[in-house]
Amino acid sequence: MQRIALAAFLCSLAPAAFAQSVAGMWDATITYNGTDIPFRMGMSGTGANVKAWFFNGDDKEVSNAGKLENGKLVLNFDSYLAKLTATVKDGVIDGEYGPILKKMCAIHAVRASDTKSQAKVNAPSIGGQWNLQNVASSKGEKAWQLILRQNGADVSGAILRVDGDTGTLTGSYKDGKFVLSHFSGSRPALLILKPASDGTLDVSLSALHGFSEMKGVRPEEARAKGLPGPTDPDTHTTVKDPEKGFPFRFPDLQGKVVSNTDARFRGKVLVVNVTGSWCPNCHDEAPFLAQMYDKYKSQGLEVVALNFEEADQLKDPTRLRAFIKEYGIHYTVLLGGETDSAKEKLTQAVNWDAWPTTFFVGRDGRVRGVHAGFPSPGSGELYRETKDKFTATVEKLLAENQTSKK
């Protein structure tokens, strides 16, 4: 009788005593277009209260909800409308994440190893800025920027295009090359850098839109050789007639139609942001725009986001609502239509092809500036310069005498 009672007691303890915990750090890979891309993720909690986070440099992309039941792990990332589903067995996670560009991607993870025990490596110095030549751009670019920060064998940085960057790539030097990667819920990327004997870099990139090989050259050397430089994001896109402002007329999330001619915008500085909640670089820009609006709205600043989304998200913009909540957005958000319709609806824009693109309209109603793209903190000083430039433009326009809108 005592043995039966003991067995029953042990059975009652089994689910709690032997349930696997996922709390802690994990070394993971995501397979995208046949390439295994390493990244690190963290998790906490148990049962129906599991949380996970991906890293983008020092920033974290945190799941909105998650659970672990009977070895089945489910994590939701609402601001990307993505989900991670996996099995957890013997300290190994196997499953899939997505969609990323409509694809589900295999995920594999094991408990994180102790990198501190690794022997020191004498790595060549590659820190600083580089120009990347032979780029594969659909936007007419001839060069991109590569920004690297180095601490011994460890390197972090980003590739900056006219529309934005790769997110923070991190990695280290081993076997004659630097291997860096990024995955934070979006834009998976694997970057391999091989220092050449002539002081250049052989660069291989596997990312969202395929594989490419480039040559890294220091900016001063590129100028001396007459090589093309990166595209200027302040001149890449223009408008047909600055005097005519930037017209828009779209519904907000409650269905109310908002127009640039509404009285609420008259005599105000207006920042019009062409964006989409599906766009990683738009995620980079949104928190800064939210902070800028909250700081300057009492001085006469208005920010309007023209969001272009997929058809199903226009009917029920769940991802956009999560996007607004995540970044604390208090400015006006409008539904512009499907992404493919943006060009025909943005009637003033010339050479517009970057998500996001931001138009600055003065108190007089004239377009005073356009900026294509937006970098992430991974671009370092160039990220800070872009934020400073936006702030300086807004402050200058706010300081101008208020005039009636033309």
Predicted feature residues:
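Central antiparallel beta-sheet cores of small beta-barrel/beta-sandwich binding domains
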Residues: 20-89, 97, 103, 116-197
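A short beta-strand-turn-helix
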Residues: 248-270, 293-296
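Sec/Tat signal peptide C-region and signal peptidase I cleavage site
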Residues: 15-19
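Thiol-/selenol-based redox modules, centered on thioredoxin-like
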Residues: 354-406
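N-proximal helix/coil linker or "cap" segments that precede and/or mark the start of modular domains
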Residues: 208-251, 263-267
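Short, internal strand/loop/helix patches
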Residues: 249, 321-363
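Short pre-active-site segment immediately N-terminal to redox-active cysteine/selenocysteine motifs
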Residues: 268-270, 275-278, 285, 310, ...
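Structural microenvironment flanking redox-active thiols in thiol-disulfide oxidoreductases
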Residues: 284-327, 338-346
